[in-house]
Amino acid sequence: MDVSSIERSRLKGRGITGPAITSLKLVVTLGCFVYLARNGQFFQVIDVFRTADFRWVSLALACAVLQVPLVACRWRLFVNAVSPSTQVSIWPIVAITAIGLFWGQIMPNVAGDGVRTWLLAKLTRSWMRSLFSVLLDRALGLYVLVVISLIALWLPASYQLPDGLRMISAEILGSCAVLGAAATLLTPLIASKLEGHRMARWAVDALTAQKILLHSWTGPAALGVSFVVHGLAILAVYALAQAMNLPLSLQSAVVLFAVMVMISVIPIAIGGWGIREVAVTLLLAHHGIASETALAFSLSFGFVFLAASLPGALVFVLYRPSPSPERAS
């Protein structure tokens, strides 16, 4: 087999792998909902929705909508930090962020990041700048989520979780938090060991990331925005709990948020749908909450953030990023 044949085989394999993985995630999502529907819970869920206090639901929706420009602001910090000689204005970033969040809701999360990278590359004529800024944005957002989840596991409200699950989760999240911080702090040492190695290019990128995160105002600013973004999501969880008259305190909402979102980012279902509902239903059962109410609560969380992302669908249809001269910094 010649080189060209091998390359064609690789490309063909990649073309098959993507749809296959998406199909498997769809099967997992559908399987979870079939499991939940086995007792006809969905008919009872409709009754729960009918009695929900839509003033609280509106507050949750407002929190979800407000996240979009905040995520855009955080991402723009990285976009402009990667190439400080030129600046991208906020409005194209808001538009692209809205589009990416929409695709992330209806497809695997990586699809949203892929769309963001593609559209920003069309705007800036730089794939490197686009991909690097998206990776930084995603990495910081996930790291803050890990930290919040770790804190949540030590709140008194988390003591109602099964001890084994709580301790294992704390160990995993703690390890991730320590490894992430250590990798960032030790980047110069790691990079020096990779000089002359084929991974030296990655070392240069890592040094750039460390400089942005630790040696400029961009890192602290993006960190602050990340905590606000996740804080809004926690408030949305609390508001939805109040809308359905669930006996959950704000502290319990922090714990529930950590469980819901950490499960949602596990790449085994479409946008976390299905697996999130199963986990929340089982978790709230420990609080004595009826399964149909727990399912309605979890679905409402997904619906609220899906509704907040819907403007991104319209923007996707209307927005056409065209390369234009960027403002000098």
What are these regions (language model features)?
Residues I148-Y159, H286:
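Transmembrane alpha-helix termini and helix-breaking/packing motifs in multi-pass membrane transporters
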Residues M1-A98, L155-V265, S291-L299, F303-S329:
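Predominantly cytoplasmic-facing regulatory/coupling regions of multi-pass membrane proteins
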Residues N80-V82, R116-T124, L284-H286:
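Helix-loop junctions at the membrane interface of multi-pass solute transporters
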Residues I268-G271, V278-G302:
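Hydrophobic alpha-helical transmembrane segments in multi-pass integral membrane proteins
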Residues A95-G104, P108, F132-V144, V225, ...:
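Alpha-helical transmembrane segments of multi-pass membrane proteins
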Residues I90-K122, W127, S264-I270:
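Hydrophobic alpha-helical transmembrane segments of multi-pass membrane transport proteins
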Residues P69-W75, M107-T117, Q251, V265-V280:
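Transmembrane helix boundary and interhelical junction motifs in multipass membrane proteins
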